[in-house]
Amino acid sequence: MDGKTEMTMTTDVEAVVRRAYHAAEGNVMDVQGFIDLFADDGVINASTKSFRGEHLGWVVEFLHKFTPDIHRELHRVVVLGNVVAVELSIRGTFSGPVETPAGVLQLTGAKLDTPGADVWYVEGGKIKEFSCNVDRGSMLAQLGVHPDFASAVEAQAAAR
């Protein structure tokens, strides 16, 4: 492949990923447009769960629900063939309460500025796989949620 063709392919792959980020911006929030960028068998791997089909939009809808001004600041974008790696910060302001297994957190006005690293695999102009990696510990600390090591130690002792 000559350099010109390779550059066009790389640029097209990056453009698909940038369109996905744009569709997920708080001031845009085009969930269907985001989903339409994925291949029919496309998948999002986010933390401990994977999402496919109609559930692809849940990932962006979930954060937008609590941070309607969500913005992803892209610090570094690296393209290698059909793979795009992105170092970013996810920023926004929480606009309301968040339900948790332990009760409701009142987070109105809390600021979010969490680092992350995403890896995208694009085939035939469509996203085949998106691995979303967010520094969950940093995010929780910013929201005043800290690990409860005492409960973990007690639960482990009780299980013996």
Label the model's feature ranges:
Residues 1-40, 150-160:
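Short, low-complexity N-terminal intrinsically disordered segments enriched in polar/charged residues
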Residues 11-15, 31-96:
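A solvent-exposed, acidic/Ser-Thr-rich amphipathic alpha-helical stretch
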Residues 71-73, 112-117:
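Short, surface-exposed coil-to-beta transition loops
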Residues 77, 120-122:
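A structural signal for short hydrophobic beta-strand segments in well-ordered beta-sheet cores
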Residues 96-107:
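Short, surface-exposed loop/helix-turn segments at secondary-structure junctions
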Residues 128-160:
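Low-complexity, intrinsically disordered terminal/linker segments enriched in charged
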